[in-house]
Amino acid sequence: MRICLVLEGCYPYVHGGVSTWMHQYITVMKEHEFVLWVIGAHACDRGKFVYELPDNVVEVHEVFLDDALKLKEHGNQKGQLHRINRFSEEETKSLRELMECSHPDWEVLFHLYHDRKMNPMSFLKSEQFLNILTESCLEKYPYIAFADAFHTMRSMLLPVLYLLGSEVPLADTYHAISTGYGGLLACLGGYVYRRPVLLTEHGIYTREREEEIIRAKWVIPSFKKQWISFFYMLSEAIYKRAFRVTSLFTNAMLTQIQIGCDAEKCRVIENGINYDRLSQIPLKEEDGWVDIGAVVRLAPIKDIKTMIYAFYELSSRMENVRLHILGGVDIVQYMRKLDFTILTSISEGQPLSVLESFAARRPCVTTDVGCCRELLNGKEGDDFGCAGYCVPPMYRDGLAAAMEKMCESRRRRIRMGKSGQARTKAYYRHERMISEYRKLYREVEEAYGRDWI
């Protein structure tokens, strides 16, 4: 089977949990060919991969959102305007609903911008666009400067309309690794070639964007609700079109259903790691120090600032502690030097760094995000025991107290480490995860036939 993986802002451009997962996934699935359809922010990153692509990656198609800013109106502007002025009632309705971030008919928009090659700039400079925007502003933003609404709407719509005109790589199935822009491209692929669409979410993309927008200073406060609705609208598109939607843990699946995904489509497939590679790492010998590790990429969502503040507080109470912030290293070599690990993210899915730490018999202190609490304490029916401490995000004092408690007793660390290792061995092995995805692809074959490329 030729599978088009639709990726946004991760593999193969940057290291990180999702990128590591993706690289291992492709490498093991040797029986399939993979096409990478990747969305990046900046065209200057074209071809700058930090991974050596496996042999079964047969094509890479790169799309960069800043290329949308280079769009110009077609030379045949009169023809474009003629088509805009003759939008059907169905097309006008879908464009209005797109601008209102409600429930547009995406097939109508795919036909308009992909099949008929409507130029996004022609529409965004048209009288039709201004009329729809004016009506919306009078209804929703009567006291907001029209210029603010105009530029907000253009910046919101331009990337989407640009992506709808993308050249679509041919594949047997389109497997998106997030909702958002990536999910929309997967829907476009399914539309163009009438092929099935799959979705795997490592986190809940919509909720992550919502958190970012709430904190963002670049978004005009009056339009934050509109931006949040925009990303919910994109999620709805792939939730409706996807044949199956997978998540990493039960609460994430329940969130998908709450947002609007059909429960019948949803399935939990937990992350998996190379357990055997990590389980043989010996515990660090006692040397008078307690060494704490953070295996993390430097990104705002990882909240390294709180980690450093919390460690400063800890070091004022205990003199024999050291913090190692690691990224892009051979985890096997560094894990030998650590007594336990920490994770301070403000948002996560099912962090591989925690599972890797458990496999090596190192307990963890984490923030209460994603399924971290489930990893530490176990899900229903799991009696392996506690494997660490969980504290609220951005809670500096709580994090310092949890680290101090972990530092106080080597015996406790060993006991918790054994619990984490047993849990990982039972539920989070890479072989088990791959088996579930192979089963998923077989379901696609059975549902859609085997008329593959």
Where are these regions (language model features)?
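Membrane-proximal helix-turn-helix segments that form the acceptor-binding/catalytic region
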Residues: 160-170, 192, 204-205, 222-245
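Aromatic "clamp/platform" in nucleotide-sugar-dependent glycosyltransferases that forms part
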Residues: 346
